[in-house]
Amino acid sequence: VGLEMCIRDRNGYRHASTDDIVREAAISKGLLFHYFENKLGVYAFVYDYSVRYLLLELSTAVDAKETDLFILMQQVETGKMHAMCGYPYLQPFLNRAQAENVNEALVAVEERKQQMEEAYENIYARADLGKYAAAEDVVKLRKMMELTIKGLMNERILEDAFQPEMLYEEILEYLQLSRRLAERSGQPSDEEITEK
């Protein structure tokens, strides 16, 4: 499964080769197709497994009573990190699958994709944005953090010795910076203070 994620992450569904998978896994193509029938079957299985595994990690990492946005984001990243400790290419694979444009692949994973999106929506829906003056800005800040995290992940994956724990530590630094920016945006600027 981890090998398949790695290959699919690098190549996407369209360009992923079953020849590469069987060569790297040291299994026969017959055995691969015995269990999965075709490339789409392998892709759907790996996607399904990845989402279920990630959701399990999120369910243990995210406190159901937490309402602080930045703590929720940290807990989500903790769950992702735990998942990537088992399967280093899990999150990059899921990120790449989000951008997939092959119709048959999209249809094959649509239900699980929806389940994952709903899980994230449920987590972030309970975030209390009321303590920030500009809640819309905090939503944009969260989107900016998601893109930053994906970018960091893409950079670190290219390194030969990818370590999810080191990526996690770097992500926490960015989350702390974002918290400070959001909290600062809720306070009046120097200009607003002098005008009063």
Residue ranges, per PLM feature:
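Short, small-residue-biased leader/transition segments that mark boundaries at the very start
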Residues: G2-C6
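Helix-turn-helix
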Residues: R10-G41, F45
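Short coil/turn segments at alpha/beta junctions that flank glycine-rich nucleotide-binding fingerprints
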Residues: N11-R14, K65, Y87
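Short helix-capping/turn signature of helix-turn-helix
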Residues: F36, N95-V102
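Histidine- and aromatic-rich ligand-binding microenvironments
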Residues: F36, V42-V62
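Amphipathic alpha-helical packing segments from all-alpha helical-bundle domains
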Residues: R52-T60, T67, I71, H82, ...
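Hydrophobic/aromatic-rich alpha-helical bundle segments in the mid-to-C-terminal region
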Residues: Q91-R96, L106, A127-L175, S185-K196
